[in-house]
Amino acid sequence: MRNFDITSAETLDGYARKIGFLPFFKNSIRGFSVEEMCPPSLWFTDRPGPWEWKGPVIRKGNCAYGKFFKNKAVYVSLEMLPHLCNYRRDGYDFDARCDDGLVFYRDKDVYDIIAQSGGIISKDVRQKINDKDIDKYFTRLQMQTYIVTSDFVYEKSKDGRTYGWGVAKYATPESLYGAELIRSQYKTKPSESFEIMVERILKYFPETDRQTVIKLIK
């Protein structure tokens, strides 16, 4: 996993599905990131690279994308996503979490806008909720798996060319992948889902200390 094996959106998608999880940036597990698996020559060029591949990979529909590990971006295969949701949600759909008083009110405001829209760019949410801490709410909802990044939207010039950094578009995982899939592991104990995720990563990075994996995904 330490070779420069990711050279396109297709190979990125393939590795994310194979491993089950693929962080975008370097982390505590050596070699376990797009940053390390993609040649330096493909970053920040005039041609599409890892930054620009995010949208196409998400749109393929094989992987979810969001800030899932330590508030950092990760691709998660649809095979592993139900286990991540089961573990992070700990038996709570969002409404149930609200009923038990476990949700910050601003998180609920953000979630409701995203859920009701079916998919909305972050800039539009910012306009509806004027709060300097809104990025914190986006991140917390992603870490809890109640929202995911559904695409990246780019500005276009008069001649139709895209430019600048892509703006994240958010949706609920249920609206993107279906509630049946997302909740398919709800009968599994969250601790069992966690163990399945740990073992999956160790399968591909066996030299990694188990505790390191636990700390990364906990």
Predicted ranges, named:
Residues 1-218:
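Long, low-complexity intrinsically disordered regions
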